A protein has these predicted regions:
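Fold-level signal for large, globular catalytic cores of enzyme and receptor domains
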Residues: 5-16
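Solvent-exposed soluble domains appended to multi-pass membrane proteins
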Residues: 16-218
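Transmembrane and membrane-interface helices of multi-pass
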Residues: 1-2
Length: 218
């Protein structure tokens, strides 16, 4: 209430009033339904609802249509969008538009991050990405988020080219990362993909790999 009393911006106070008057409870009908389960998080870099296609992407289609899907949810296209949205998914914090928040605050520790939530429950946590540290300091960020082990394209031994458009294979990411965690009794693994990354105006090895299969699409 003090926040409302001290705020002079009417728009901000409209939001403040909305949130303060919400009926918040620590439990609902979904509380505990996944207790004791393992978790694999896949952050898909540079994709959209094109994959909601049963013919071409049956697994993703099944996950989207038979699981929980949140339509009124948006990833902000701000400064360094991948790193910032990755940070949001790990901490539930909104990132700052005028800086690469993940890199700017890479030395912070985040006890509330998703890795630490699972660490506190006795899980083995790990994270993986099929690219190098050119853009985001994941080697620092992920451990500070609580990831017990972070492995990039080199440690996963995934072939790749330093040419900008030659992104590594996400298929190999899954194949190389999975053995590191799948045999743990309780695990939480976080994978960030890269293959569909821009640019989209030039050919690339991964981009052309299945091109003939989509010849009927515009």
């Amino acid at each position: 209430k003090a926040l409302i009393e001290n705020e002079v911006n009417k728009t901000y106070n409209k939001l403040n009033n909305y949130f303060i008057n919400r009926n918040i409870t620590p439990k609902n009908e979904y509380t505990g339904i996944f207790e004791g389960k393992n978790l694999i998080v896949i952050l898909m870099e540079s994709t959209n609802e094109i994959f909601i296609n049963e013919k071409e992407y049956p697994t993703l289609y099944k996950l989207y249509t038979e699981g929980f899907s949140f339509r009124n949810n948006y990833s902000p296209r701000n400064n360094c969008s991948t790193g910032n949205n990755e940070m949001t998914s790990m901490t539930s914090l909104f990132t700052i538009n005028n800086t690469c928040t993940a890199n700017t605050y890479k030395k912070n520790v985040y006890p509330e991050a998703i890795f630490n939530i699972f660490n506190n429950k006795g899980y083995t946590t790990s994270s993986y990405h099929d690219y190098a540290e050119y853009y985001y300091a994941r080697r620092t960020i992920h451990p500070n988020m609580g990831s017990m082990a972070y492995r990039n394209v080199t440690e996963l031994k995934i072939p790749w080219s330093s040419v900008y458009e030659e992104w590594p294979s996400d298929t190999e990411l899954v194949e190389k990362a999975t053995p590191y965690f799948i045999n743990e009794e309780h695990f939480m693994a976080y994978l960030t993909t890269v293959t569909p990354h821009q640019p989209y105006t030039v050919s690339s090895e991964m981009g052309n790999k299945h091109l003939e299969e989509f010849s009927d699409y515009d």
